[in-house]
């Protein structure tokens, strides 16, 4: 018989004052778990052991509406006055939306533990400060280099590790404990200037590496808001850059506060992200989530991203001249919120072919555009599948449409590309988006889309008008 863990979450809201932050309390049978506040929303993390019943109480404000996401994973939601109870039967990411404005995220992760079959190197035992007061760049970099190829796990216990950019090499295994944070030093932007031919600033750099594993319940914090405020556009940097690497596995971590795109995967193969949480500053421009760029066999699964820009943008940027085709990208089982596009390919499509891309079983809670395909630089998009994705609310930004597929020339010298063999199947828009969806091309015969079992507000779409889809020079089949 499964052990039942009772979890109590109390949301304490006094009559709100200007600028006042709500107070939250979260506890279970093992005691209180600290609640984190970040940019107008709150979250809590804990290891999921068995069924969890959560109790949510909103004080100082009547609980007039309650929504819990993903809807398909939460079946037992009850309310007594201002208290809401929720039964969680499996690990994952859950979101509460109270009175259509208060967001609370629960990260109930699979428990992470140090491997027992490998030697462990505790980085603190190497004399490295974990108070966050001292910069430890050279010491941590040396530890990374020594761990590379050693067969040992480099272990970061609880604490704050302040550093400038770090490079992770081949055959490296890192484990970040819960409450362990690798944090970007904000004192000198020049230390982030690239020193190789890849002219992109980055904090954590995995370059020319194979067999890299980084996992655990810890965090990597780019301090992007502070850096951008202090240094402006100079501080637009990737929190993580994976470049020309193979067999990279990232699991369980939280990537927080990038200065620009959170994670770029450039010219790499066999890269996976599982249960990774991207927490971007939603008021900071250009903070994409996951950006697979000229890469092959990338898996993004059971992840979370809250972004000011695209949640996922699969592209070929030709960064510093590096370019190859895109193949076999899968985004599955994730929960996303964004002010821009959520499930996107493009806009940069500077290669020849981008094929075999699957978006499956994702929950998009907020987006300006749910599904987006943009070809502006002449590439061909082939075999793009949107299967069993759910879209809840429109975020009021530039386009405000559920589907936006466009083939155009970026400039007069650009070539026209193609979007072919696109399948939208078993996808649901809980609410209609305010503007018409668009599927448009500058010339005929360049876009082919098959739509099957598309629902808007519980009504099956059987025509372009019912789907609120405006079409130009495109072949669309609906059934």
Give the location of each predicted region:
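Positively charged n-region of N-terminal signal peptides that target proteins for export
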Residues: 1-4
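Sec-dependent N-terminal signal peptides
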Residues: 6-9
């Amino acid at each position: 018989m499964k052990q039942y863990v009772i979890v109590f979450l109390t949301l304490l809201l006094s009559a709100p004052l200007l600028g006042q932050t709500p107070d939250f309390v979260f506890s279970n049978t093992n005691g209180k778990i600290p609640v984190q506040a970040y940019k107008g929303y709150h979250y809590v993390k804990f290891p999921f052991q068995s069924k969890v019943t959560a109790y949510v109480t909103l004080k100082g404000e009547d609980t007039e509406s309650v929504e819990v996401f993903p809807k398909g994973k939460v079946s037992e939601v009850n309310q007594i006055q201002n208290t809401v109870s929720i039964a969680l039967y499996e690990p994952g990411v859950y979101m509460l939306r109270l009175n259509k404005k208060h967001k609370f995220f629960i990260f109930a992760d699979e428990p992470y533990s140090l491997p027992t079959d490998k030697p462990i190197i505790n980085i603190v035992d190497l004399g490295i400060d974990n108070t966050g007061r001292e910069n430890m760049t050279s010491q941590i970099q040396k530890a990374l280099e020594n761990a590379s190829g050693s067969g040992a796990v480099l272990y970061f216990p609880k604490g704050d590790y302040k550093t400038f950019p770090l490079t992770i090499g081949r055959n490296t295994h890192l484990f970040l404990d819960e409450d362990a944070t690798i944090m970007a030093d904000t004192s000198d932007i020049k230390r982030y200037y690239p020193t190789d031919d890849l002219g992109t600033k980055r904090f954590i750099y995995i370059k020319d590496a194979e067999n890299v594993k980084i996992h655990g319940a810890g965090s990597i914090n780019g301090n992007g808001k502070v850096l951008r405020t202090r240094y402006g556009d100079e501080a637009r940097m990737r929190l993580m850059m994976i470049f020309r690497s193979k067999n990279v596995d990232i699991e369980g971590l939280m990537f927080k506060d990038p200065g620009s795109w959170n994670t770029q995967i450039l010219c790499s193969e066999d890269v996976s992200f599982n249960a990774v949480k991207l927490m971007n500053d939603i008021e900071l421009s250009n903070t994409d989530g996951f950006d697979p760029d000229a890469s092959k066999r990338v898996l993004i699964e059971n992840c979370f991203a809250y972004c000011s820009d695209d949640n996922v943008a699969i592209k070929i940027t030709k960064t510093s001249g590096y370019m190859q085709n895109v193949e076999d990208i899968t985004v599955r089982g994730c929960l996303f919120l964004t002010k821009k596009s959520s499930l996107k390919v493009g806009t940069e499509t500077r290669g020849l072919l981008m094929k075999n891309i699957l978006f499956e079983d994702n929950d998009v809670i907020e987006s300006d555009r749910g599904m987006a395909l943009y070809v502006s630089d002449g590439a061909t998009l082939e075999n793009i599948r949107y299967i069993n994705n759910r879209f809840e609310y429109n975020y009021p930004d530039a386009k405000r449409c559920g589907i936006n597929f466009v083939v155009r020339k970026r400039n007069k010298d650009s070539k026209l590309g193609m979007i072919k063999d696109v399948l939208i199947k078993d996808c649901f828009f809980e609410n209609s988006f305010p503007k018409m969806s668009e599927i448009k091309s500058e010339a005929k015969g360049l876009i082919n889309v098959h739509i099957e079992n598309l629902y808007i507000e519980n009504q099956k779409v059987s025509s372009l008008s019912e789907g609120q889809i405006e079409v130009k020079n495109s072949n669309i089949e609906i059934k």
